[in-house]
């Protein structure tokens, strides 16, 4: 076996007929498969043991030689080599064809490769190949032209006229001769000469031909290899035949396709031997050609060959294509051993790094380790007995299992894995029952709930895998989300409710105004029932030595509540005491207003002091973020567990219930509804009189009902009692929002119609009153629309993620610093008056390109290339700096990746990014994962109109990343200057806008309907919009430069996500956008060898120009090209990655003609060939490290391979 980790690249090319014969172990001459009586393979058939190897290990076909000692002997009776039966998966055969046939990929693809080489149209080729016309191969000294087509009749006439002075043939033989005659060097030289003068279509065609001929010339492939004299037969175990019960056989479709080829081939041989008439032979040759076409790519030409039940047979090409093809099914996604799946259940008592593993499942997963341990402890005499013991589930097995799983992390994965937090490592704890227990706080990252979700579990086997699982993947380390650096592990539901209830304050509860010496006293008083949880009390802070109080505060009494004292007990000892849910308290400690002097009457203070709000979900998240920033992973993980326990306990004590009486009724509701009805009647009258159009009427009716609903909603909010259980749930962020209440207590409002609009008749009832039958029916439309939209958009979003991952998977942090001198000027993003992304958000975790100085004092605030954390970024913003030039992924010079300085901080852990981080994949996941949230927004409003509908969301994101023309396209100016006129042109139904620049003046004609956003006298810059809508980035890149286009795309993507309230770090979008703009099209090749019109990587282009300039030549010129992500993925340098993405056959056809070599730089291509991925710990710099031995060598840790070897040994002894 070759060691995949040894080779550097992988090349693909065309196979000549001689090459095919050299691969083969023998010729398949008969179409037979296996004998129906003996079930043994037939001689010379498709399963012949002489060609492909024995069906049983170390045994020839006739049974003369059995056992391993005859290894390598070829049996003199049956001719079968004695070897492992595994060779039937690797040995190929071949079929010698009686007539050459063309390979359908090269004749049929677009553009037809054969057509380009021969300069013939695909239609002409088809006529020749399928025996409809003759083609002139050598006109001799006749008036005929080479490659001229003739019908049968014309051919006979010319024969009569010229005799055998010329040579014309039909079929693949003719094409083969023509291809052999092609003089590559001559044709290339001639085409290059022609290109200098050619224009239009002729030029395009010449460039295409030149491209393909040059590819043949450089790759060493010969054009006539596109025609085959022999075809390979793939190993029999890759096209198996298995017996079903009832004596029938199931076989791979390939066997049927091969059988047809062999049958026709043998018939053709016989006809040729019999000297049959030409017309019969031609027909048989045509049928052979069709049979080979069907074998290679069934259905590419004409009707596909069908099997039983009219099902098209799966050919060799189909085996590679699509989700079920070889690439995506078997190479990129394999099923693995040591894995299982089960339903998940909540494990509220678990620590954050633990998961509950059902006993039976653990026993099966860790079986080899338990077996080894049993033998080691002398509890079983050998591996076999140990296995028996486990199968019987003896009592002493469980103790061994307990010991074996200690310190061995397992991986839990929930599908769909939308981002990298969909797989995390946990330490297993054995539990009873059959369900996996999951920590409640890990649900957010997995998007899991316990309504029947299932999860898969995997066991990392090797020491390295275990170390990586523990160091890099342990759930306790994944507190921040990679997309925005905010905590993803935030308490929700019960935990939020419990902590909200705990920190609630109420006036005049038991023990109000008591003053305590320290926290222990407070807790004792609470436990003995002297004080209520929500009572406001005084507490001396003198004993809290570690907490950051001011000296002045230490001598005073702090006013707080019993619950808050309990809450602060779980916080780190030197963390500020939390008394109010504000950032000020979180960062700087308790404000002075909560302190009273010794001797001051606390009751007087409490009488005038307002009740402080309890801690809601958002504040809990801020606490976690702050603790993570200061104390890092371990302490945060402990805090989360404590917060969880506290929350559950308090939620239980609170005993919150919801009854129908908790849904308040709004007395003035009826009045509001009646009022709206009156307004609608007025509008209808106006419409009937013809004063307004139907569209206006519809819009106004919708507006009236939405206003009525908003009015009811506002009054409901005002009338809610803060201790109402429903309002507590909503206010704390545990469950539900105002829209749910409006539907419960107010009115449901307008419903979505199936056509995507709104129904004019609202549902005026609420759920408490109950809906009428008519209202119920109307509600079902919206609910169904919500469900179907969700289902459709989830698929869309998943496909978007797949394309994003594919285009960016090879972007990895490759070096420390690329040394670029360019940067990106950034400022806050605004849309009109609305803030989309503040400057602070864009600065955190980035490095400035130049030193940042305070504009007023002139002092240096941030040095060049210094990573900005939250404090520095805030300081820069506070100093009044409005724009900063930062290092950006856009301007990074690193080839095939990004450098540390241009990328900045790794958002998932708040540290500077490390070399080897797969930032491309993380970026793709960060953009794709919220895509599903964008889509699922519909789901929760139950189809109520006015709920956020995200039609602009996902489709707009796809439009941007696929570089499609926007729906509402804006007109942009090509010159910088003044708008001198905006005139109407009634004849054309347009308006003319004239912009006068410094050197030239441009006029733009826009339709009447478009919204013009400039007026006379305005100064505008080139690339700016004159009408409303979205700019087409392909126009922008022509008018402005690449950086402006990149910036525009970044702005647009951020706009869509931020409007939805979803935060994504700029750098993720930058990574994706850079991948769309990394190609250039060569305009003038200068003295380089590049062909005009070639699409190539910027880095490769600059390298070629660099070499040309050094040798004193004229450099090539190019222009940047914006590619959509699908196109960019297919244009990658790796043919393996492209082929496994889409259009597999087209990619492989092209790659083989060019003799492409895959440099194996990305992740995908390495996964395909089974090499370790070149990211993270798989990078060369980490792989070639020599481990140092510290201290004595410990006892060797056993591995799976040791145990398997031991089992095999015991089997062979028997």
Curated annotation (Swiss-Prot):
It catalyses: RNA(n) + a ribonucleoside 5'-triphosphate = RNA(n+1) + diphosphate. It is an enzyme of class 2 (transferase). Zn(2+) 1 binds at residues 60, 62, 75, 78. CDD domains: RNAP_beta'_C, RNAP_beta'_N. InterPro entries: DNA-dir_RpoC_beta_prime, DNA-dir_RpoC_beta_prime_bact, RNA_pol_asu, RNA_pol_N, RNA_pol_Rpb1_1, RNA_pol_Rpb1_3, RNA_pol_Rpb1_3_sf, RNA_pol_Rpb1_4. Pfam families: RNA_pol_Rpb1_1, RNA_pol_Rpb1_2, RNA_pol_Rpb1_3, RNA_pol_Rpb1_4, RNA_pol_Rpb1_5. Binds 1 Mg(2+) ion per subunit. Belongs to the RNA polymerase beta' chain family. Keywords: DNA-directed RNA polymerase, Magnesium, Metal-binding, Nucleotidyltransferase, Transcription, Transferase, Zinc. It comes from Latilactobacillus sakei subsp. sakei (strain 23K) (Lactobacillus sakei subsp. sakei). Its EC number is 2.7.7.6. This is DNA-directed RNA polymerase subunit beta'. Mg(2+) binds at residues 449, 451, 453. Zn(2+) 2 binds at residues 818, 892, 899, 902. One of its GO terms (biological process) is DNA-templated transcription. The keyword Heme does not apply. The RNAP catalytic core consists of 2 alpha, 1 beta, 1 beta' and 1 omega subunit. When a sigma factor is associated with the core the holoenzyme is formed, which can initiate transcription. Its cofactor is Mg(2+); Zn(2+). It comes from the Bacteria. GO terms for molecular function: DNA binding; DNA-directed RNA polymerase activity; magnesium ion binding; zinc ion binding. One of its GO terms (cellular component) is DNA-directed RNA polymerase complex. DNA-dependent RNA polymerase catalyzes the transcription of DNA into RNA using the four ribonucleoside triphosphates as substrates.
């Amino acid at each position: 076996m070759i060691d995949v980790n040894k080779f550097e690249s992988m090349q693909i090319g065309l196979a000549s007929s001689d090459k095919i014969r050299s691969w083969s172990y023998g010729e398949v001459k008969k179409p037979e498969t296996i004998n129906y009586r003996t079930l043994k393979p037939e001689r010379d058939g498709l399963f012949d043991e002489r060609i492909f190897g024995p069906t049983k290990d170390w045994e020839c076909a006739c049974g003369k030689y059995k056992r391993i000692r005859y290894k390598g002997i070829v049996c003199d009776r049956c001719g079968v080599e004695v070897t492992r039966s595994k060779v039937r998966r690797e040995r190929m055969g071949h079929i010698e064809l009686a007539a050459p046939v063309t390979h359908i990929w090269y004749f049929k693809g677009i553009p037809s490769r054969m057509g380009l080489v021969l300069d013939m149209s695909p239609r002409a080729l088809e006529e020749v190949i399928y025996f409809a016309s003759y083609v002139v191969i050598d006109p001799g000294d006749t008036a005929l032209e080479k490659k001229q087509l003739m019908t049968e009749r014309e051919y006979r006439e010319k024969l009569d006229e010229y005799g055998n002075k010329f040579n014309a043939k039909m079929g693949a033989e003719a094409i083969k001769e023509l291809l052999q005659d092609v003089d590559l060097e001559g044709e290339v030289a001639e085409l290059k000469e022609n290109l200098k003068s050619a224009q239009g279509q002729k030029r395009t065609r010449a460039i295409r031909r030149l491209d393909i001929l040059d590819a043949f010339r450089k790759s060493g492939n010969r054009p006539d290899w596109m025609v085959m004299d022999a075809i390979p037969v793939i190993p029999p175990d890759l096209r198996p035949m298995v017996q079903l019960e009832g004596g029938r056989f199931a076989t791979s479709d390939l066997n049927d396709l091969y059988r047809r080829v062999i049958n026709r081939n043998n018939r053709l041989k016989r006809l040729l031997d019999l000297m049959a008439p030409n017309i019969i032979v031609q027909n048989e040759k045509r049928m052979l050609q069709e049979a080979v076409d069907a074998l290679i790519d069934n259905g590419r030409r004409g009707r596909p060959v069908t099997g039983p039940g009219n099902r098209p047979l799966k050919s060799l090409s189909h085996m590679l294509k699509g989700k079920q093809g070889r690439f995506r099914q078997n190479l990129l996604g394999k099923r693995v051993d040591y894995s299982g799946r089960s339903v998940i259940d909540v494990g509220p008592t678990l620590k954050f790094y633990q998961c509950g593993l059902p006993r039976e499942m653990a026993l099966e997963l860790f079986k080899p380790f338990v077996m080894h341990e049993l033998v080691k402890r002398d509890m079983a005499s050998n591996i076999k007995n140990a296995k028996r013991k486990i199968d019987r589930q003896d009592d002493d097995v469980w103790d061994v299992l307990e010991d074996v799983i200690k310190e061995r992390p397992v991986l839990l994965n929930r599908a769909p894995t939308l981002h990298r937090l969909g797989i995390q490592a946990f330490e297993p704890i054995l539990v009873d029952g059959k369900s996996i227990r999951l920590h409640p706080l890990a649900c957010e990252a997995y998007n899991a709930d316990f309504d029947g979700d299932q999860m898969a579990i995997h066991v990392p086997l090797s020491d390295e895998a275990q170390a990586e699982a523990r160091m890099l993947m342990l759930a306790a380390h994944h507190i921040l989300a990679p997309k925005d650096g905010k905590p993803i592990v935030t308490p929700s539901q019960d935990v939020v409710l419990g902590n909200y209830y705990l920190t609630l304050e109420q006036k005049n509860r038991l023990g109000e105004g008591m003053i305590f010496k320290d926290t222990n006293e407070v807790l004792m008083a609470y436990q003995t029932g002297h004080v209520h949880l929500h009572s406001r009390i005084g507490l001396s802070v003198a004993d809290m030595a570690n907490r950051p109080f001011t000296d002045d505060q230490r001598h005073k009494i702090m006013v707080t509540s019993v619950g808050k004292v309990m809450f602060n007990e779980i916080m780190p000892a030197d963390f500020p005491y939390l008394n109010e849910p504000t950032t000020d308290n979180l960062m700087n400690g308790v404000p002075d207003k909560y302190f009273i002097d010794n001797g001051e009457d606390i009751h007087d203070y409490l009488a005038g002091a307002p009740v402080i709000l309890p801690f809601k979900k958002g504040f809990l998240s801020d606490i976690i973020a702050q603790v993570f920033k200061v104390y890092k992973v371990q302490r945060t993980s402990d805090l989360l567990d404590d917060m969880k326990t506290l929350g559950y306990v308090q939620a239980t004590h609170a005993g919150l219930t919801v009854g129908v009486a908790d849904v308040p009724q709004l007395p003035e509701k009826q009045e509001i509804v009646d009022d709206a009805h009156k307004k609608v009647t007025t509008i209808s009258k106006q419409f009937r009189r013809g004063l307004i159009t139907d569209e206006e009427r519809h819009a106004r009716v919708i507006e009236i009902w939405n206003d009525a609903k908003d009015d009811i909603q506002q009054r409901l909010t005002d009338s809610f009692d803060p201790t109402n259980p429903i309002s507590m749930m909503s206010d704390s962020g545990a469950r539900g929002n105002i829209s749910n209440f409006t539907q419960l207590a107010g009115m449901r409002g307008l419903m979505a119609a199936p056509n995507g609009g709104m129904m004019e008749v609202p549902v005026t009832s609420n759920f408490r009153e109950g809906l009428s039958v008519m209202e119920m029916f109307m509600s079902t439309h919206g609910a169904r629309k919500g469900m179907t939209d969700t289902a459709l958009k989830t698929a869309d979003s998943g496909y978007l993620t797949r394309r994003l991952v594919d285009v960016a998977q090879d972007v990895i942090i490759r070096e420390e610093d690329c040394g670029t001198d360019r940067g990106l000027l950034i400022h806050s993003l605004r849309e009109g008056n609305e803030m989309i992304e503040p400057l602070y958000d864009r600065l955190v975790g980035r490095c400035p390109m130049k030193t940042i100085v305070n504009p007023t004092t002139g002092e240096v605030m941030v040095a060049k290339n210094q990573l900005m954390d939250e404090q520095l970024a805030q300081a820069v913003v506070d100093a009044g700096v409005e724009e900063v030039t930062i290092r950006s992924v856009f301007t990074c010079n690193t080839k095939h990746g990004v450098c540390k300085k241009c990328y900045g901080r790794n958002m998932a852990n708040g540290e500077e990014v490390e070399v080897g981080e797969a930032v491309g994949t993380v970026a793709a996941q960060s953009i794709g994962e919220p895509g599903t949230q964008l889509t699922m927004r519909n789901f929760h409003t139950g189809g109520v109109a006015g709920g956020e509908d995200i039609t602009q969301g996902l489709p707009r994101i796809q439009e941007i990343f696929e570089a499609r023309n926007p729906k509402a396209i804006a007109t942009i100016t090509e010159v910088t200057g003044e708008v001198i006129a905006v005139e109407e042109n009634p004849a054309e139904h347009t308006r003319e806008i004239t912009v006068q620049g410094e050197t030239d003046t441009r006029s733009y004609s826009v339709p009447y309907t478009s919204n013009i956003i400039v007026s006379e006298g305005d100064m505008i810059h080139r690339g700016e919009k004159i009408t409303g809508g979205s700019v087409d980035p392909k126009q922008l890149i022509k008018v402005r430069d690449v950086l402006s286009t990149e910036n525009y795309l970044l702005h647009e993507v951020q706009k869509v996500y931020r409007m939805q309230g979803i935060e994504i770090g700029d750098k993720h979008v930058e990574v994706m956008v850079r991948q769309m703009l990394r190609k250039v099209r060569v305009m003038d090749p200068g003295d380089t060898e590049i062909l005009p019109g070639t699409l190539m990587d910027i880095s490769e282009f600059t390298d070629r120009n660099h070499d040309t300039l050094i040798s004193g030549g004229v450099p090539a010129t190019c222009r940047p090209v914006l590619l959509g992500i699908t196109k960019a993925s297919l244009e990658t340098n790796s043919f393996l990655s492209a082929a496994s993405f889409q259009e597999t056959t087209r990619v492989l056809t092209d790659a083989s003609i060019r003799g492409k070599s895959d440099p194996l730089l990305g992740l995908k291509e390495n996964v395909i060939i089974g090499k370790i991925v070149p990211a993270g710990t798989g990078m060369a710099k980490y792989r070639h490290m020599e481990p140092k031995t510290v201290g004595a060598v410990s006892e060797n840790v056993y591995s799976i391979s040791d145990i398997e070897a031991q089992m095999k040994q015991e089997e062979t002894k028997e």
